[in-house]
């Protein structure tokens, strides 16, 4: 039934081909659109995950990437390797500012703790195994528990094939479930990242903007044991040999060319209810923007006199800035739109369609009403707990994770909570280890006190009584009183020491209960309350999954009846989007946007300082017009970036852009500020994404980075 829903929805498509984040197995159903758009490959080949080109596409667990050589070289965005560059940077060796290039395998650096490369091997519909006939009869927490149990069982069976990570992902609000089987490469090394003056050129000023001149590229390498199996970092490991890797385009791209992007988009919200739209744009995003601005100011103030601390928080600052501007851009677009009115009208039309037929009314009407009530309950609880969630010191949250792990370790693995099974321990260890280079007590205290003071000012009825009692929060406490409470907690803990943190992994609940460490004691005291809250969330989650899945079933049937396309919202799994390279004749700044930018734009923007500090070697090469074979005859220059009519979102960063022949032509790295609201409401006229042109990457590697070894490896020389 589930596969037929997808197939029928696509066969009746009336949507423009540029819209849609298609699952690979859906592509044969849009073969006519793909061919009409200009694809030269057989669309059926794109469904074969272990063949070319899909076999070259990988996930970094938050970004997308691709194999680009037979020796496991992986191309992605600079901002996707940023955390690893920051992790390896010190005041004496500032790789963020100066860039990094390994001239041979021996010079490559371990990526940040927890870094992974995931190669998708199979996607299988397991909907009937997850929501069995027995599960379908359940509701609330019993339903949540049963679904989780089935997911864990399916994943465990899949992971008997050692070296693989298997995940059961939900689609269409829990209507369908697919098993994603991925090779998990655990030894990831940093190979190359350009200087910040290239990879982050324009900084937050140019982020989400056009025209753009950012060289947003970087390289990792995948390593495995000598027998070719996934393994932890070891000097004895060897480069992974992928079955497939991308070939460099033989010809440059031009406006009007077919383009497709293969990657792992994170989240979109196009199937959300009107109440979810209103909640997000009236409260959630505005609150996020306000809080982000405060946090950025706090981090800037507490790190301004300490370069090492600033480096520790560089990746977090970049992330906050990115989402701050993203959310503000969405709010600006929403303010001038009729999106809520249209979503409301569409939802009312759905309900009218359901009520017009007795059979449909019997099947769907109750769940449509219920899902609206459950969403209202969920959103109210999120509002209530907003400041509480950010009022806990990072070391306290670390202690809570470690104590939870200790308790889960007393159970058989199949009975442990997802996230705390044996398969999850390496991730937890990496997270604990990463604190060495992304945590500072002074900064953490400043962030926590800002949130805690807001939380403590709430009426007692809106606060968490258990948390208050454990931490020592009372009505009427001043900021100074709260700071004194925090000072005592931080001073009473040794978890700021890396060795001390690591030592708690594997200890028993009794060890935790016997500890006098302030954060450990607080974690133990909070455990019962945490479990109670989790059970309440699962009770609501089980009800919501049941109602939301039926809502989506109704919506799919309704859209089919109107001849509209139905593709699932992005959920971090492999997708394909296609369109064409194209400018915009109505740019957000009131001008016509050309499809390409060139290196002359870099020189024009370069100031020699801050976000626009282009390397002198690059500026000299531009001035001398030393373009070589990367010259575009029509542009009479080297293209830096280009616009395309592709449907992407966060998570697509680092995705390979391919031409009609499946050749590599660039890397997707950003969207346009006035069109990122397409995460919620696709806008065909405005939506554009930005790719860094492969020719700019190669030209820069040749003339600025002098990465001749990598150019040779990729057969660019």
Label each PLM-derived region with a short phrase:
Residues 1-7:
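Sec-dependent signal peptide recognition
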């Amino acid at each position: 039934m589930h596969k037929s829903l997808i197939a029928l929805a696509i066969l009746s498509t009336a949507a423009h081909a540029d819209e849609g984040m298609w699952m690979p197995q859906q592509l044969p159903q849009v073969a006519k659109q793909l061919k009409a758009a200009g694809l030269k490959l057989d669309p059926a080949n794109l469904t074969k995950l272990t063949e070319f080109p899909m076999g070259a596409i990988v996930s970094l667990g938050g970004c997308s990437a691709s194999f680009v050589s037979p020796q496991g070289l992986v191309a992605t965005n600079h901002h996707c390797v940023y955390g690893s560059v920051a992790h390896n940077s010190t005041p004496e060796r500032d790789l963020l500012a100066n860039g990094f290039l390994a001239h041979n395998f021996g010079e490559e650096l371990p990526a940040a703790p927890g870094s992974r490369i995931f190669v998708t091997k199979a996607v299988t519909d397991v909907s009937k195994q997850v929501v069995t006939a027995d599960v379908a009869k359940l509701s609330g927490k019993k339903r949540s528990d049963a679904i989780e149990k089935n997911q864990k069982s399916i994943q465990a069976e899949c992971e008997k094939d050692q070296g693989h990570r298997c995940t059961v992902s939900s689609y269409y609000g829990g209507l369908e479930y697919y098993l994603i089987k991925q090779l998990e490469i655990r030894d990831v090394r940093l190979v190359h990242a350009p200087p910040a003056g290239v990879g982050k050129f324009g900084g937050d000023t140019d982020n989400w903007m056009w025209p753009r001149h950012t060289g947003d590229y970087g390289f990792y390498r995948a390593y495995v044991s000598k027998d070719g199996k996934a393994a932890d970092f070891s000097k004895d490991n060897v480069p992974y040999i992928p079955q497939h890797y991308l070939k460099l385009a033989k010809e440059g791209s031009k406006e009007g060319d077919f383009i497709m992007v293969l990657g792992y988009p994170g989240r979109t919200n196009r199937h959300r209810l009107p109440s979810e739209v209103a909640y997000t744009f009236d409260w959630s995003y505005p609150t996020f923007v306000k809080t982000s601005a405060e946090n950025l100011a706090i981090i800037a103030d507490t790190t301004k006199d300490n370069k090492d601390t600033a480096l520790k928080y560089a990746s977090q600052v970049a992330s906050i800035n990115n989402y701050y501007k993203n959310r503000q851009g969405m709010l600006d677009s929403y303010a001038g739109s009729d999106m809520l009115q249209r979503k409301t009208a569409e939802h009312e039309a759905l309900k009218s369609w359901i009520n017009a037929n007795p059979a449909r009314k019997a099947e769907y009407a109750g769940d449509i009403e219920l899902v609206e009530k459950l969403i209202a309950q969920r959103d109210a609880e999120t509002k209530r707990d907003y400041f509480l969630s950010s009022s806990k010191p990072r070391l306290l949250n670390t202690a809570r994770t470690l104590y939870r792990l200790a308790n889960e370790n007393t159970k058989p693995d199949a009975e442990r909570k997802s996230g705390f099974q044996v398969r999850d321990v390496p991730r937890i260890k990496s997270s604990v280890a990463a604190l060495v280079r992304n945590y500072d007590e002074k900064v953490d205290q400043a962030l926590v006190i800002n949130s805690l003071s807001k939380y403590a000012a709430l009426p007692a009825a809106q606060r968490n009584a258990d948390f208050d009692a454990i931490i020592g929060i009372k009505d009427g406490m001043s900021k100074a009183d709260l700071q004194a409470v925090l000072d005592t907690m931080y001073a009473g803990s040794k978890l700021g020491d890396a060795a001390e943190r690591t030592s708690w992994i594997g200890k028993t609940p009794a060890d935790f209960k016997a500890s006098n460490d302030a954060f450990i004691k607080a974690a133990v005291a909070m455990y019962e309350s945490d479990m109670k809250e989790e059970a309440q969330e699962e009770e609501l989650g089980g009800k919501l999954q049941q109602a939301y899945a039926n809502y989506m079933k109704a919506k799919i049937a309704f859209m089919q009846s109107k001849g509209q396309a139905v593709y699932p919202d992005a959920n971090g799994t492999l997708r394909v989007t296609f369109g064409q390279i194209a400018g915009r004749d109505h740019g957000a700044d009131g001008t016509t946007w050309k499809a390409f930018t060139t290196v002359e734009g870099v020189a024009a923007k370069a100031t020699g300082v801050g976000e626009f500090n282009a390397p002198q070697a690059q500026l000299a090469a531009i001035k001398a017009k030393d373009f070589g074979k990367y010259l575009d005859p029509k542009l009479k220059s080297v293209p830096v970036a280009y616009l395309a009519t592709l449907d992407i979102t966060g998570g697509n960063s680092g995705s390979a852009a391919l031409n009609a022949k499946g050749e590599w032509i660039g890397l997707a790295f950003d969207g346009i500020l006035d069109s990122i609201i397409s995460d919620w409401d696709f806008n065909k006229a405005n939506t554009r994404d930005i790719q860094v042109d492969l020719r700019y990457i190669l030209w820069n590697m040749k003339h600025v980075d002098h990465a001749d070894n990598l150019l040779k490896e990729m057969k660019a020389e």
